[in-house]
Design a protein with these regions (language model features):
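Unchanged
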Residues: 1-129
Length: 129
C-alpha cells in the first residue's frame, strides 16, 4: 500500500470544511490515515461553487503557493472532491456524502465511511515510476 504525502478534500464552503477537518482529525487520531500524512481541506474560492475543474485548479494553486513545481516534485497527492449539498441524502448533509458510513470496520474495529474505502482503494494503486 502506498501512502500519500498530502491528502486534500475539497469543500463547498467554510462550514462544510470545518466538518471535514473534524472527520480527518478523528481519522488521524484513530489510525485510519497514516502518520505523517499532511491533510488539508480547501474550500471553493469566494464561497462560490466552481465545479470539479475549478476546485482542482484552486487546489493546485494553493499547494504551489509560490513554490511552483517544487511543491509537487516527488510527492503523492490525493485530491478528493467532496463538496456538495447531499440533496438526495439529507441525513448525511452535515458530514458530507464522502463521510457516509458503510457497513464495515477498519483493522482495529473502527467504523468506516465511504472516504475510508476510497483512500484504501487508491492507496493500493501503484505509484508512478
Amino acid at each position: 500500500m502506498q501512502n500519500f504525502d498530502i491528502l486534500i478534500l475539497t469543500a463547498a464552503n467554510e462550514a462544510q470544511a470545518e466538518g471535514y477537518r473534524a472527520q480527518l482529525a478523528w481519522r488521524c487520531a484513530n489510525g485510519l490515515i497514516p502518520p505523517g500524512t499532511e491533510t488539508r481541506v480547501i474550500t471553493d474560492p469566494g464561497g462560490r461553487r466552481v465545479g470539479s475543474l475549478g476546485a482542482t485548479l484552486n487546489v493546485l494553486a494553493q499547494v504551489a503557493d509560490g513554490r511552483g513545481e517544487v511543491a509537487f516534485a516527488g510527492r503523492r497527492i490525493l485530491i478528493c472532491h467532496s463538496g456538495g449539498d447531499s440533496r438526495r441524502t439529507p441525513a448525511y448533509a452535515a458530514q458530507g456524502k464522502v463521510f457516509t458510513p458503510v457497513p464495515t470496520t477498519g483493522p482495529a474495529g473502527q467504523p468506516l465511511a465511504l472516504f475510508d474505502l476510497i483512500l484504501r482503494t487508491v492507496s493500493a494503486l501503484p505509484a508512478p515510476a
